[in-house]
Amino acid sequence: TGMVVIAGTGFFALAGGAPAIEIQTAGVAPPFSINLRFGLYESLFVFAVNLAGLLAAVHYLPRLREHAATMLLFIIMLMGIDGMIMTRDLFNLFIFIEITSLATYSLIGFEGRETQLAAGFKYIIATSVATTFFLLGTAFIYYQTGTLNIDDIMARQALIGGPVGQIALILLLASLLIELKPYPANGWGLDVYEAAPGAIASMISVGVSAGVLFALYKVLPLFGDFLTSIAVVGGITFLVSNLIGLKQKNVKRLLGYSSIGQIGLLVLTLALLHKYDQPAHLALIVGGLVINHLLAKAGLFWLAGVVKLDNIGEWSGIAGKSLTLLIFGICLVALTGLPPFPGFWAKWALILELAVDELYGWIALVLVGSLLEAAYLFRWFGHALRRGDTTPVTVPGMDLMPPAIAAVVLAVAGYFSAMHAGVVPMQLFLPVYAAFVLYLLDGLPGRFKSLLMIASVAAGGASVIGELQGVNRIFGIIMAGGGLLVAIATFYRSDTRKGFYPLLAALLLSLVILPGVRTSLEFFFSWEIMTLSSYLLITLGRDAVRPALVYLLFSLGSAFFILAGFAIGYASTGSVELASLGGAGDAVPLIFTLLGLGFVIKAGGFGFHIWLPGAYTEADDDFTAILSAVVSKASIFGLVMVAAYLGVQADIGLDPAYVLGWIGMLTATFGALMAVFQEDLKRLLAYSSMGQLGYIIAGVALMSHLGWVAALYLTVNHFLYKGILFLAAAGIIYRTGTHLMYRMGGLIRNMPLTFVAVMMAIIAMSGVPPLSGFGGKWLLFNAMMDKGWYWLAAIAFFSSAVAFLYMFRILQTVFLGQRKLEHRDLREAPAILLVPQVVMLGMIMLLSAYPRLLLDPLSAAVAPYVPGTLHWDGWALVSHLGYWNAPLIMIIVGAVWAVPLVFLLLMSLSMKIQPVKQFNIVYAAERPDRPEDTHYAYRFFAHYERAIGFLVKPRATAFWSAVGEWSHTLAASMRVIYTGNGQTYAFLILAFFVALYFANGGTV
């Protein structure tokens, strides 16, 4: 505790502007004394390492109390790490490395288990070889410079040269890199992480590695000619370690792969920042990554020690334990570089600096490695969320204190990192604050929490929307007002739904903030909060853990494309302002492609849509309505933003827009075709949502005034009819207990209001007059014909016809036909589910009769980006292809339907009507034994399979499954070197040194 207090006091004093402290021993100046420096960076590392050491000691306290020698060794290890960080003498650095290695070796095997003794033996072999290299290199450097003081060596660096100087530097570099466990010379480290006690493994991961990393930082100026090699070693280690992590199921070994990968990323970062002279960003980037890794990784090691389950598949034992899951989730989220933790701000700054130096290959490596790490970490988290047959784990509350403190410090560090990055935290952190407050109230009744959630979102929306204008205001209203309207439906469930309302508040507030952001950093922060909260909300659904993981991985892939696009925009303009993207010059096509691809993936565009049906189907029914009606609009807003800032101002030409248009129409077509053959009601609606978003994407791609008006008009309509359909589905499933349409039928008698809402939404969605969907399709077809996109217009027409087929199926199989016996007594959907449907239905009817109420504001909103106007003749919208008079169409269609209806009603007064009974059906063979056998809904469109079935074979699913399989196969081949044999590991260490030597110009 004293070490932490002293280090912390010194750090805050230095951060406040105090001068660095120079410590000299023996009463003389260096190089004749041991010289220690306690500057700002040293104090940060010492404070962080000692804090981790204190928490690790608390975690390991029973063993430390049992054996005084263990406590002594633990303190010696900590002091050795502190010495590595503070010393300014090369030989004393060697001494401190040796002290740390010996103490660590003793702690690894102190419990006397066979696996620990074997791991300790491998550890001492590896570190002995490394320190031997270090000592030899130190001797050669002393021979050439005549000093061991690091500062003096830097001043005399010109004296280091020739074969002796080269071998000296390579020996020194190889020693430090081996201590940091580079691939492939790191098998010994993985065995240590797996076998060592959790507290000791955590300190090796975050403490010893931090000390060696700081030692590398101190002597890095000596390696100016080797910086590329250092970056390559770090990059390969980061990428390969995370790739192999995909195959890992042992918890501590998995954490070992992650630790090695994170240190590899830090090595890469140090080398590249030094090579391209970016010292100003060391504090945010390197400091953020170190603190993030130190706290998150240590917290996970300690949590693993508390849970005491070796296989990730057994972690379902903590399902339902909210505090344990919260700590687990915070550490995982931080480790993967998601907001609001320090790793997010550090990776953001790192990617931007790499883009400034046009290091696009390194950007790809960092982002791919980060995606791989997220895959295996969140797979582990998914096991913890899945309630299985595993015996529940009892986790004493006090044992959670060390990882809980780590989680709290991570959150605080994230706040200060945001301030250091120049962000105004209050507005951006609003979703986090709201989620935290609601989490503290999570024990309250569910409906009361729903009320608090709605109030918080309403307050946040009111504070943001008033400042918005134009297109941003339209999306702000959809996301805030629409989100609140659909969220009213959450009242239909009376259970507590722990975790649901805090996450929903975070999601909706992040969506509310999104249209009001001004910089790419603010946009990306809100985007990632939206991604994370929506993922966690999906996991709360039935059997949703696996679909949620697929959703998260595609969402992160989408986010990384967006991040890369923003980074290149910053590199081209020198600004993070979104409005400056149009001035990116020759980089505009690349930025457009990256951002557009990111938003298309998030929208479930063709080829990237495989996450969509599973996520929509397995999420809670009321949340699926929010996911489709509201969350999907974020990607549309992103596309509009890209088109506004790049597609018009930068005049990128037709080609990128035309490609985007084809993507949109392929999405619409294949979404419709795949919906045709679905038996699951929610899955059908999921594919339908995908298809309808395709029309909107195509509208944005048109880059014309009429096209954008059509896209935004369809966006509003998509919110309305998808909100109705998914909420209606929630009510149907709530009453029937099934998703499968062939297990329904005849529900018009039980749920007439739901039937009316669904029927009207289907008419609107299908583009059939007189409702608003017809106007949207009319606008889109006109815009396509104006643009000369005749083939795309034809495909749009075909897709609309297919959409009517599958939507007709919902009416026919769910509401019409014969009713199941068990459904005779079903009631109408809960009233609170019907309220938002009625409101949205009223809006559809209003827009169908008076579309100008919406079209004029839309036209005015897009005019600054795509100049033009809509031509009205009274209430008729006129184009050179014709006109659309919505009120007249409503009157005509109403009359067409009203006249036959009145006639039939009059005829019924004089006719004897006999309702068709369930078994009043002619069969060619035997009479069916059960009512279920009379239902024709199963495989309703089977007769179309022979004609178009080949189009909907799951080729995209097969492709992405193959990508996953190839990744696992490659990972398996990369880890064959980890045999567990100490001699093999020693050989790989020597081979690594030889490779490093020859790669940097060494000769025999």
Language model regions located:
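Transmembrane helix-loop-helix hairpins at membrane boundaries of multipass inner-membrane proteins
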Residues: 1-74, 151-155, 419-504, 575, ...
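Juxtamembrane membrane-water interface segments that cap and precede transmembrane helices
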Residues: 23-38, 186, 469-470, 870-883, ...
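Alpha-helical transmembrane segments and their membrane-interface junctions
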Residues: 332-350, 408-422, 762-779, 841-862, ...
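Final/C-terminal transmembrane alpha-helix of multipass membrane proteins
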Residues: 260, 399-418, 690, 843, ...
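Hydrophobic transmembrane alpha-helices and their helix-loop junctions in integral membrane proteins
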Residues: 55-64, 68-71, 79-91, 105-348, ...
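Alpha-helical transmembrane segments and their helix-start/interface "positive-inside/aromatic belt" motifs
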Residues: 1-2, 118-128, 321-324, 398-404, ...
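Aromatic-capped, Gly/Pro-kinked transmembrane alpha-helices
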Residues: 397, 420-424, 854-893, 901-1004
